[in-house]
């Protein structure tokens, strides 16, 4: 993800990045990139043992590289740990495009601006050569200056500790338990997918599971990963969308993908659990599991249905590879950082020949009989798109990218359906009008929920401004003279039988 504007400019014969011009005082041309890679090589040689990091870390963990430069450290870590997920961020978009599949880069990204990357969610955060480039000492108090006076008089082990190197590995910026001590009730799964006796229960956070922000309740597990609330108002909104999807589908309202009636179904980001409960009621011989970051699922669910929360499906799973007959994901855009990595994980957990189904809404407003430029609904979507991109969990949806990522993950027989979602019942067709009535209700309940955290956290908007644009969007959504619509995308993809 790079800047849409010209990303570089020339000064004194050298090239500098143009994003937040002047923040970083070093160039970013090819000569500078060579210099950064030379320093990376120096650090790997200067370290006594592991040339990449000293801090304890899991081999399948989540690694974040701040100010990644050319991305060389992130790429080396991704190649060393193929089961890990590595993200590099930088002001300048100078990272290669041919990086490992378990590695992602986001630029331009200013890590001295507010983040929305998920608190309590990273196993290791790495920062290298940042002194002199902003107020990182104030932002990251773990960055202590090395004791220069007695450097060579110390023992070798001490002089090479991570506290005495500018190549810093920040293991725990936030107050979090080491990975081995995190909630483990949902990770007690055998490889064949059969849950252990101790894991058959709904798992919730041992810490306070929710916190309040701008008058709405959000889940506290890995705070900030998911930018939508989880209070009763939000739960009603999710259930309305579930109803909308069942109405918008032509035939089976729950899923299109082939599936056995007595199969094993996994619902990722299950929300209130309504889809999982409906499937469990429809197929009493099936076994249905729903996982979510927020423990908001009901306790009175069917006996053949289980919920596990908090559960971050972008972190490593232990739920039985090759064991699920269908994996379902609904409205994941805006909450996922690395789609290719997630698709590979889904692929690994499906039985050979089993199916994955994904349902997404493309919120970009469309209209066939008039331009929407200048309308609040168009401006709102552009703001939402930018805010979620800055948070590295974009809400905008691209079907070509989705199909490509599914193919690269190994899926075959990919089917893609598109359904129009009118914002109000302006259409003459009765089925379209029924869909529109449900979608109008869903949108009216969604504008403020979708806007609150992205606009306040990323743009620092106050509540009055957020509510004002939300009200304008709702007014246009109710206006039958504006024939706007969104697109519902439904994908089915099969894991090959062989």
UniProtKB/Swiss-Prot annotation:
- Which reactions are catalysed by this chain? L-methionyl-[protein] + S-adenosyl-L-methionine = S-methyl-L-methionyl-[protein] + S-adenosyl-L-homocysteine
Q: Which Gene3D superfamilies match?
A: Vaccinia Virus protein VP39
Q: Provide the primary localization.
A: nucleus
Q: Which InterPro entries match?
A: SAM-dependent_MTases_sf (IPR029063)
Which terms under GO biological process does the entry name? methylation; sporulation resulting in formation of a cellular spore
Task: Write the record's keywords in alphabetical order, separated by commas.
Answer: Methyltransferase, Nucleus, S-adenosyl-L-methionine, Sporulation, Transcription, Transcription regulation, Transferase
GO CC, any one term: nucleus
What subcellular compartments does it reside in? Nucleus
Query: What EC number is given for this enzyme?
Result: 2.1.1.-
Per its record, what triggers expression of this gene product?
Expression is negatively regulated by hstD.
Relate the assembly described in the record.
Component of the heterotrimeric velvet complex composed of laeA, veA and velB; VeA acting as a bridging protein between laeA and velB.
UniProt record similarity statement: Belongs to the methyltransferase superfamily. LaeA methyltransferase family.
Write down what this protein is called. Secondary metabolism regulator laeA
- Which species does the entry assign this protein to? Aspergillus oryzae (strain ATCC 42149 / RIB 40)
Record gene name: laeA
């Amino acid at each position: 993800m790079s800047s849409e504007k010209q990303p570089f400019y020339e000064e004194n014969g050298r090239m500098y990045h143009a994003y937040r011009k002047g923040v970083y005082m070093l160039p970013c041309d090819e000569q500078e990139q060579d210099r950064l890679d030379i320093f990376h090589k120096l650090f790997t040689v200067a370290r006594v043992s592991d040339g990449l990091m000293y801090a304890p870390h899991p081999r399948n963990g989540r690694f974040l590289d701040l100010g990644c430069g050319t991305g060389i450290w992130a790429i080396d870590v991704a190649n060393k740990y193929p089961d890990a997920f590595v993200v590099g961020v930088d002001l300048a978009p100078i990272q290669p495009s041919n990086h490992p599949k378990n590695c992602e880069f986001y630029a331009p990204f200013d890590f001295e601006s507010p983040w929305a990357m998920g608190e309590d969610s990273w196993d290791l955060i790495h920062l290298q050569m940042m002194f002199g480039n902003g107020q990182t000492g104030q932002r990251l108090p773990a960055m202590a200056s090395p004791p220069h006076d007695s450097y060579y008089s110390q023992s070798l082990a001490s002089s090479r500790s991570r506290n005495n190197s500018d190549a810093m590995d920040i293991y725990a910026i936030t107050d979090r338990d080491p990975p081995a001590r995190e909630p483990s009730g949902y990770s007690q799964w055998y490889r064949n997918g059969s849950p252990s006796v101790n894991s058959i229960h709904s798992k919730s956070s041992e810490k306070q599971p929710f916190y309040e922000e701008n008058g709405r309740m959000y889940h506290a597990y890995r705070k900030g990963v998911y930018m939508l609330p989880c209070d009763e108002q939000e739960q009603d909104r999710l259930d309305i969308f579930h109803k909308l999807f069942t109405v918008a589908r032509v035939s089976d309202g729950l899923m299109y993908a082939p599936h056995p009636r007595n199969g094993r179904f996994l619902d990722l980001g299950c929300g209130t659990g309504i889809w999982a409960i409906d499937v469990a009621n429809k197929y009493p011989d099936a076994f249905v599991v729903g996982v979510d970051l927020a423990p908001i699922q009901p306790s009175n669910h069917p006996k053949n249905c289980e919920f596990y929360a908090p559960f971050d499906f972008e972190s490593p799973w232990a739920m039985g590879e090759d064991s699920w007959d269908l994996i379902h994901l609904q409205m994941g855009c805006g909450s996922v950082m690395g789609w290719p990595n997630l698709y590979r994980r889904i692929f690994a957990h499906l039985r050979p020949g089993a199916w994955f189904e994904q349902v997404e809404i493309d919120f970009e407003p469309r209209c066939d009989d008039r331009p929407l430029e200048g309308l609040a609904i168009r401006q709102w979507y552009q703001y939402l798109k930018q805010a979620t991109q800055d948070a590295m969990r974009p809400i905008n949806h691209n079907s070509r990218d989705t199909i490509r990522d599914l193919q690269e993950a190994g899926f075959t027989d990919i089917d893609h359906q598109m359904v129009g979602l009118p914002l109000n019942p302006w259409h003459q067709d009765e089925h379209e009008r029924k869909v529109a009535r449900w979608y109008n209700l869903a949108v009216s309940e969604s504008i403020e929920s979708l806007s609150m955290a992205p606009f306040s956290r990323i743009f620092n908007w106050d509540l009055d401004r957020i509510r004002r644009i939300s009200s304008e969007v709702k007014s246009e959504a109710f206006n039958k003279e504006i024939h706007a619509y969104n697109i519902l995308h439904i994908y089915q993809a099969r894991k090959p039988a062989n």
